[in-house]
């Protein structure tokens, strides 16, 4: 499903929750009747007041990637590293080796699985497991924007939830009993599978009922500067280019090839003449300037002039 301007009607009053410091994952909508609670370094989410069944609780643009790319993103991004459980040493306090080991642990503790890939969230990963949950997650993979495939997670209430009640979801009939906590539900695997199947069916049905509202939120987000930047960062990660605080901080061989190809293509240098493959700060700056000009065409005049100056210096 493509996102186009036809979904933009009556959206100017829709609140869009955003955190510009998070460069890979974004909460697009958060129900105002929930709050986050932290105790002994563990987080949970509670209701402030009653939430009726069938309500949208959270809508989140999530990060989907293979295991290697996912842990490299966490390892090289300060916000995601410090946010993810277990929160022991801070990003700035870790050696490179220790940060790599912790990133692997954080990935296993905070991700969902989808089609063999890892799915990283910011808000939904704070919600604890219950084999009889009061909320359900729907993973929406039907959107693309500018040729970029993007995945959203939707969280809905499936019961009337009283005030001051913990929000819970099911991690799955098996996974929910394998994580680093003890489930005391006492239910058999067969019972858990039956409940999980019902919950999944409810989440799909409620998502369909809320489809128009969700499309409007997604349109506002994907056409915003923040949404475009995060989609770009997702794309760069698939190429082996990793961002922290708006700067390229790590590059794989594939990433270096992507940077060289774009810069040399813009400079109209023939492949036979591309002798200098070294990634320099100057080349990275040129790469990011070209990308910015494509992503934000309204600023393209200034960006184009900057690239021209770089070409002349080169």
Swiss-Prot record:
Residues 23-172 form the SET domain. This is Putative SET domain-containing protein L222. Gene3D superfamilies: SET domain (2.170.270.10). The lineage of its organism: Viruses, Varidnaviria, Bamfordvirae, Nucleocytoviricota, Megaviricetes. It comes from Acanthamoeba polyphaga mimivirus. Keywords: Methyltransferase, S-adenosyl-L-methionine, Transferase. GO terms for molecular function: methyltransferase activity. The keyword Metal-binding does not apply. InterPro entries: SET_dom, SET_dom_sf. It comes from the Viruses. Its EC number is 2.1.1.-. GO terms for biological process: methylation. Belongs to the class V-like SAM-binding methyltransferase superfamily.
């Amino acid at each position: 499903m493509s996102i186009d301007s036809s979904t933009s009607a009556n959206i100017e009053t829709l609140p869009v929750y955003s955190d510009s410091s998070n460069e890979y994952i974004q909460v697009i909508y958060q129900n105002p009747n929930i709050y986050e609670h932290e105790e002994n370094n563990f987080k949970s989410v509670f209701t402030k007041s009653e939430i009726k069944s069938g309500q949208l609780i959270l809508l989140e643009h999530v990060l989907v990637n293979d295991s290697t790319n996912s842990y490299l993103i966490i390892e090289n991004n300060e916000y995601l590293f410090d946010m993810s459980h277990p929160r022991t040493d801070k990003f700035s306090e870790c050696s490179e080796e220790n940060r790599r080991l912790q990133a692997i642990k954080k990935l296993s503790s905070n991700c969902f699985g989808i089609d063999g890939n890892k799915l990283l969230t910011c808000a939904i990963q704070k919600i604890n497991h219950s084999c009889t949950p009061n909320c359900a997650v729907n993973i929406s993979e039907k959107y693309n924007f500018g040729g970029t495939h993007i995945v959203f997670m939707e969280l809905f209430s499936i019961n009337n939830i009283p005030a001051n009640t913990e929000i819970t979801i099911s991690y799955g009939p098996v996974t929910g009993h394998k994580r680093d906590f003890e489930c005391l539900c006492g239910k058999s695997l067969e019972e858990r599978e039956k409940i999980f199947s019902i919950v999944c069916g409810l989440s799909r049905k409620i998502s369909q009922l809320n489809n128009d509202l969700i499309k409007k939120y997604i349109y506002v987000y994907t056409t915003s500067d923040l949404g475009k930047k995060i989609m770009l960062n997702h794309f760069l990660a698939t190429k082996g280019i990793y961002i922290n605080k708006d700067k390229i901080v790590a590059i794989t061989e594939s990433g270096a090839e992507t940077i060289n190809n774009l810069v040399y293509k813009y400079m109209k240098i023939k492949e036979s003449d591309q002798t200098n493959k070294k990634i320099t700060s100057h080349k990275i700056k040129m790469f990011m300037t070209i990308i910015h000009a494509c992503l934000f065409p309204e600023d393209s005049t200034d960006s184009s002039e900057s690239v021209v100056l770089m070409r002349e210096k080169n």
